[in-house]
Every structure is written in structure tokens, then in C-alpha cells.
Amino acid sequence: MDSTVVLITGCSSGIGLHLAVRLASDRSQSFKVYATLRDLKSQGPLLEAARAQGCPPGSLEILELDVRDSESVAAARACVTEGRVDVLVCNAGRGLFGPLEAHELNAVGAVLDVNVLGTIRMLQAFLPDMKRRHSGRVLVTASVGGLMGLPFHEVYCASKFALEGLCESLAILLPLFGVHVSLIECGAVHTAFHEKLEGGPGGALERADAQTRHLFAHYQRGYEQALSEAQDPEEVTELFLTAMRAPQPALRYFSTNRFLPLARMRTEDPSGSSYVEAMHREAFSDLQVQEGAKAGAQVSGDPDTPPRALICLPECAIPRVTAELGWSASDKPGQNKSCYQQKI
């Protein structure tokens, strides 16, 4: 029987790396994996993991692919010697963290280019053949940040919300062509993402008013204490296999059910008020913003007390609403920089 040909983007670290090695080393030896990276200079950890797991010869091939470049996508597609991709995994992603007004527009555009347009470029390149063959699976690494808005992650959440709409729309159409699309909704995941977050091009915190800067600094302090609750990427990769092997795959698979109560809150109250109030309460309830404060006024409350609860985007730290609803925890965004942006 022919191997299942899988192409995965964003395999330099994290979920992409672990999924590529997990499939290539599977006992069934039924997968041929094309693990793609934006820059082949970053393939060292992937090669090391493949050797450690004993991936059989020919089970894993590493390709250069930059999801921001249609020509790069086409070149990688041409390198697939089987002439087909049975499972496409859109995993490459970029994060941006900080007050919205502090972000450079080119940093905002970079996030949207990778997370949204990059996924669209991959779909445009590989969907036509899947539809012609009446066979194929598309798995997209999604996020709790695509199901609910979170402060200081406005741009990241906007990009992930876009993926939800994109994939849900395709999920209605594609079964007519024998193709299925699934979103793997991740919570907090232990990855190297927080080590890749950087300031500089992400923006200048000084652009934000003093009150917003105070809230942001307060908000960041909860990451360290929340990191311990994050899932391991190996655990999350098994969910991808579940979606790949399901006879009739679902649109969404959740790596944790801890944030589902808030997701339900958004649908049960279409006005959005219940969710907004709950998130505001959990994120900022220990800070009392002075009524009628002038621009630059101080915010009362203990500046050394982190928010009561935090959660994390897959590979990107975000606030969480947990104390009452049981969400999962988060990654730490590395050094104390004003804004953060992930390199891919």
C-alpha cells in the first residue's frame, strides 16, 4: 500500500517538528513526511530529533518553504516526488504581543501575511489536486485566540479568527470533493516560541499612554507562574493523528477542554457582553482603574501582583480566564520587552 504523503509547514521547532518526527517514526511506516522550514539553516533540531527517534531512511524529507512567497510554495510542491500530498498541515505561525498602538504596521502585516495569507497560499497550491483526486485532508494549527478575543493579542487574535472563518467555510464545501479540513485548537503548549519573541520591529511601548503601559506590565507578570500548566507538544501531536485517521473528521479538535466554558459563553450570549465582562474581570479585577483619570494617570492596585489567571495561545503567551472556569495555562514570552514578534 502506498504511503500517506504528509507535508507540514513550520517544522523548525515546536508542534511542527514533533509532528514531523512522530509521523516519520511511526511503527506502521505508513507515512512519507515532507517537513518544511523557511530557512534550511534551522534544520539542526529537526535532524537531531529524527535521528533520536530512529526515523527510517526515506520517511522524512526536509524542504525549504516560505509561506510568504508563492514561488517558494510552488518550488516545494514540485519537490514532492510522489506527485501528490494526501495530508497538508498548515502549522507555520507568527505572534505579536503588546498594546495595539505600539505595533509598527509592518509588524502587523507580517503576522497577517504568515498566519492568514500564508495559509491561503498553501491551500491555493495544494487544494486543486486534492479536489481532482477526490481525496485529501487539511489540518490547520489553530488557537484559543481564534475563538475569543484576548487583550494585548489583538493582531494575533485577528489572524486566528480569520483562520476560523476560512476553514469553517471550506469545511462546508470540500466534502463534496472528498476533502476534509480540521482545526486543531491548541491551548498552552511548551515550545521554543517564547524564545523567539523579540522586540524592535514589533513596536515601541512609549507610544502607549501611561495607564495602558501599566496594565500591560501588570499583565505580563502572570506568564511565569502559568507556564507550568502548559501541554507538551508530543501530547498535542497525537490529536493531529486522531484527525488524520478519523473516517469522518470533525471541523475542530481541542487539545484541552479547559477553555470550552468561555467558548460556550460567547455563543450562548451573542451580544458578547457575558464573555467581555468575564474576561475583563479575570484579567483586570485586581486593578482599579481610576474613574475620570487624565491621560497618563496612574492605575491603583499592586503593580507586583500578576493577573489572577492566564492562558496561552499555542506557542504564544496570552491571558487566561481560569479561576472559575478551568482554563489552561501559558507560555512565558521570554524577556521583558515592550512588544514581541516571532521569527519563523
UniProtKB/Swiss-Prot annotation:
Q: Which GO terms describe its biological process?
A: adipose tissue development; bone development; cellular response to metal ion; estrogen biosynthetic process; gene expression; lipid metabolic process; lysosome organization; skeletal muscle tissue development
Name a GO molecular-function annotation: protein homodimerization activity
Output the PROSITE patterns linked to this UniProt entry: ADH_SHORT
Oligomer status and interactors: Homodimer.
Provide the family line.
Answer: Belongs to the short-chain dehydrogenases/reductases (SDR) family.
Function per UniProt: Favors the reduction of estrogens and androgens. Uses preferentially NADH.
This chain belongs to which protein, by name?
A: Estradiol 17-beta-dehydrogenase 1
Gene this chain is encoded by: Hsd17b1
